[in-house]
Amino acid sequence: MSRRRQNDEEDEIQMKRRRGAPLIGDVEKKLQEVIGKVGDKNTGSSIEANLEKLTAFLHDDLEKYRSSIIDIVAGCAIYLPNRVTVYTTLVGLLNAKNFNFGGDVVEKLIAEQQDLLLKQKYQEAQNLAIFLCDLGNSGVLTAQSIGEYLESFIAAAFEENMPQVRNDYYIQTVLRCLPWIGKELTEKAQEQMENIVEAVGKYLEMRNKNHVPLLRVWREGSTDQEQEDYLESLSAQIENLRTANWMQNHIPRYYNTFEAVLQDALQHNLPSFSSPEHTSDMIYPYPLVVFRLFQDADCGTDSQLPSGHSIDRFLFEGEISWIIEKNQFNRKSCARELLAFADENPTAPVGFLIFETIFGQMLRLPHAPYPAIFHCSLVLELLKLKPNDYPNILCKTVDLIFSRADSMQPICIDRMVDWFSFHLSNFQYRYTWDEWKDCISNDEFSGRQVFLREVIEKCRRLGSYEKIIAALPSDFVKIHPASPEIRYLLDEEDAMSQRAETFTQMFQERQPADAFLKELKSTDENDELPYNINEFGVFVTVMLKMASKTYSHNFSALFRYKDTLKTVCDAAEQYQEKLLETLYSCWKSNQQMLMILTDKLLKMQIIDCSSVVGWLFDEKMWQEHNRQWLFEVLNQALEKLTRQINVVEKDIKDLTEKVESKEKVTEAGDVKMEEETVVDEKLKGEMEELENHKEKLDRMVSFQRNLFNDFLIAFVEEIKSAATNTSEMDGSGDVGGSESSKFLWLRGRFCHVLLAHAETLLKHSSSIAEEVFSEGADPNISECFNQFQSLRF
């Protein structure tokens, strides 16, 4: 047979195969496509009609591709929560035609839910709970068994000696299911429904709510909208819905169209929920406080804003949040889908809810769910797509937040500063600045003045100094940032000027590190330090002055004289303190340079975290504690240490797995005799390395714990001092004690530190409680720490 004829026959066989049964992968792709698109509203026909066609299409091949169809439906249930009722209707229609299929779907979903909970994917597991409950509306599951299923969640929440955050999650899951299944349970499983309502009420009564003040964006009583705990708010919304006989207009119930078919279908019983065993390494979602910004009067539109305790408000926010989550890596598609959602719901001012949700996420405590740059770019994209309406909504948003800034948590002010400065940089820093000039006369710890001052400073970092000053009204001169130039304080009359000239000449001659070390050697026999500390300060001053032209020049100087700096700084802690003091003295008016160089010194291991923290909380630096840059540097240093510990922990985990794997191989006798010695040597080496890593981790964790304790003690002392010494002289106004703006600001910064490093500090909470908050601690500050501890209570 010729090669050409053979190839032709093979091609013919391939073509026949393609015309015949398609490959499994192709079938799955086609199924995924048709099932995934059944809820699309732009197909030219109704969703009900699409469901009917899809049911007929799937039923024909149900036995052949059952497993694939079930997997795809399960994926839709988990990852498309906005189409719950679409897919529960589909499952209901298929169950009416094939009873076993409905049972297989339920079995698959139950298994998936358990797996998701074990993987700590709590949102996805909650999506499945809602889906399973809604199957009761589409004739797949009995109302009685769904009631028992929800009761088992409540039973899990009442288990003893469990973290409250775990119990909260199970109660929240029950409450989130009720908008879908509440009416059905009330009509067909009244006893279970009453048990659920009673148990939820009992749980909320006995629940600890210490965390609520700490997670509020604004201090209690400072706004006309209550900042409620998320469970309390959802419970009130559900109670109002129940009072209204479960009537709401947001959830589309496609199964009602097929009631005649679905009501005759055989139903399955949903097994009771079995909660995974709790272990100490399980991390549950933090509690939340509901963010509210707008009331109906703020919107000024014909459509009415749902009230805070309306279930529609919850459902709108949930759908907006899901659209953002789904598109968190694509701002353009996110903005388009948000606008499409607003167009689909003309009866409500969805634009206001979109901005309220975005800023609620941006200001969420303890952590925002997405990087700041995503929210920044999403807002810009929304303004671009809706230029006639959304800029006005954004202006109202900013004005409302600014008007409440005096009672705002400092950590939230920081986030608003970061967003607003970035936003203004896209509009040449133009804004209605004159409307805010009244806050310039406020004291320097006033939240509104801090916000305005820090926004201007951040804008200066993003643009030129001259451009920022030109954009500001003349009234703002009091809070203008200083010109960002280096401060060189050595002149001819200075006693150290001669030494400065010597160092300048040595730098120009590019002399080696040894020459500088020799020059810095102390000549005083009574000096306990090996190097003259004042001359070291002069050396650093001259180096920074000569390298002050650009960031690159500064980096180059640090790398060139790294050996000199490191040798001196390793000799004693005082040299690290002197280096940082000199750096601050030179670059005080350029906070960005100060932050970048401090970070670079940490990365080069010339200084360590403890020296940075000690410097920032030295009494001489208290004057800077109303500035954002200081806490940015602090958090950078502490996060760097935490990351280093995380790396060592990962190394230990990897080494442990290696050692255990080799031990199993050795014990099983799978190693050849001639290779046994080599394997034993490798195992011994890895075990020694593992022990060394464990010892290193113990040292690092101990260092971290002591560092947090020391600086928190220093911070508490400063706050206590602020409570007793506030006066007009220190910029804190004429109100003294714990009501002064300075005290409230510093206490807010204390909460900021706790929240920014929540995961780490919660591990050391018992040590902090013992070392920092012993007898005699200020109750105002102790209360902050008690609230913090309840986050994982």
Curated annotation (Swiss-Prot):
Keywords: mRNA capping, mRNA processing, mRNA splicing, Nucleus, RNA-mediated gene silencing. It is found in: Nucleus. GO terms for molecular function: mRNA binding; RNA cap binding. Its main location: nucleus. It holds the Pfam family MIF4G. The keyword Nucleus applies. SMART domains: MIF4G (SM00543). The keyword Nucleus applies. InterPro entries: ARM-type_fold, CBP80, MIF4G-like_typ-1, MIF4G-like_typ-2, MIF4G-like_typ-3. One of its GO terms (biological process) is nuclear-transcribed mRNA catabolic process, nonsense-mediated decay. GO terms for cellular component: nuclear cap binding complex; nucleus. Residues 28-242 form the MIF4G domain. Component of the cap-binding complex (CBC), which binds cotranscriptionally to the 5'-cap of pre-mRNAs and is involved in various processes such as pre-mRNA splicing and RNA-mediated gene silencing (RNAi). The CBC complex is involved in miRNA-mediated RNA interference and is required for primary microRNAs (miRNAs) processing. In the CBC complex, ncbp-1 does not bind directly capped RNAs (m7GpppG-capped RNA) but is required to stabilize the movement of the N-terminal loop of ncbp-2 and lock the CBC into a high affinity cap-binding state with the cap structure. Component of the nuclear cap-binding complex (CBC), a heterodimer composed of ncbp-1 and ncbp-1 that interacts with m7GpppG-capped RNA. PANTHER family: CAP BINDING PROTEIN, NUCLEAR CAP-BINDING PROTEIN SUBUNIT 1. Belongs to the NCBP1 family. This is Nuclear cap-binding protein subunit 1. It comes from Caenorhabditis briggsae.
